[in-house]
Amino acid sequence: MSESELNISELKKVRLEKLAELKEMGIEPFGRRFERDSMAQNIKEAFSELEGKTIAIAGRIMSKRRHGKAGFANLADLSGSIQLYFRQDDLGPEKYELYKKLDIGDILGIQGEVFRTQKGEISIHVRDLYYLSKSLTPLPEKWHGLKDVELRYRQRYVDLIVNPEVKEVFVKRSRIIKEMRNYLDDRGFLEVETPMMQPIPGGATARPFITHHNALDMELYLRIAPELYLKRLIVGGLEKVYEINRNFRNEGISTRHNPEFTMLEIYQAYGDYEVMMQLCEDLISAVMLKVNGSMQIDFEGEQLDFTPPWRRVTMLDAIKEAAGLDFSLIKSDEDACQAAWQLGLEVKAGASRGELINEIFEQFVEDKLIQPTFVYGHPVEVSPLAKRNLETPEFTDRFELFIMQREIANAFSELNDPIDQKERFIKQVEKRAGGDAEAHMMDEDYINALEYGMPPAGGMGIGIDRLVMLMTGSPSIRDVILFPTLRPRSSEA
């Protein structure tokens, strides 16, 4: 056992002794309901009205300092923290003894008068205190700077207690999602829920998680996207729908990827990718202004400006700018392979021009996209669910939004031709048979739905986690997910 573990063990022993002493005194250390009428920050903001009045507040003790027959403590709640003042002559010996047994981390209910100390600090003169939860494990003294940052993610409950800025991130995350809902609800969109377990995973290019339903004796997949179900609803006449929910992809973990993540997906009948582009710009800029109060934010040393209109560039033009390749002159698969080789890329056997365009874009362009930028005109080979462009049918009416080198949104004019869709599914199935585990499966029921007739529609997915990262200045996706997926510790492996 390490020295720190020994110290914690000894401290826990002392706290358990205090717990026993409280019970001997007839005090319940794990209290019940407590009616509070004030929060720390509200007391400070309304001090002129509350001075001298008795209030009830509850929260966690974050510090304590005693001087003989008087002492102070800091109490924290969701809104902030406030100083408590304890005096034996006011509380009496028995209740002052309760104060003396306080440990940092204990949760109390407090009744007392609001006043300002001689040093000018707004405080509460405690008249009564109630134990609501005795803390048996001491809080860490130096949590924020831990070298093992994963410990903060593993014990998020402690992270939230000792780091107010972490709490603020998740409060802001909640507000971002609320504002997105409000924006869409106000514009006539209907929030819906679609299956999390699906017999056929679809709607994205990704490796799924597989589970088994015992009663039905069948394999099911945690969804990689809700897209195909949402478009079934468009077929059914629900013309404007959205869903905010989890997706699951059995892939790697990084600062930008977590196996389960939150997406907003939106579909609008009689729209297209340009309608989605405008909606994306309007929605995100409106939420940015509501939540942050400004269209400009600093992120990793860059000042990002969300003021519309955002830059729009075709994928081919973006490649031409970044890599000097003009794919309007490179027409064949062979010439595209040669161009990719010259750039130092490893080219898979049988790679098509469209696949190589996408690969070159990912390798040479994405890292240069800092300010909000719509990249549109993706090859049909990498867009199996998007409508072909009328003028250049080898490309699609699709866009991706990039900010700070990250894909934030993906949208397109939805393919509603069941014959074309089935042909593309067949090509995806061939890729899957060739070893591409991320290629789409055939979904006959979805084809059947399209055969009833789906109106032209625009559809879009926005990555909530990555958007929250930007709006909160968080460098890792694990900073904006309360309980991210983590590698097992050696003792758990």
Swiss-Prot record:
Q: Which cofactor does it need?
A: Mg(2+)
Subcellular location(s) of the protein:
Cytoplasm
Offer an example of a GO molecular function term for this protein. ATP binding
Q: Which reaction does it catalyse?
A: tRNA(Lys) + L-lysine + ATP = L-lysyl-tRNA(Lys) + AMP + diphosphate
* PROSITE patterns hit by this protein: AA_TRNA_LIGASE_II
EC number(s) for this protein? 6.1.1.6
What Gene Ontology cellular-component terms does the record carry?
cytosol
> Bound how, and how many: what does the cofactor note say?
Binds 3 Mg(2+) ions per subunit.
Self-association state and partner proteins as the record states = Homodimer.
Q: What is this protein called?
A: Lysine--tRNA ligase
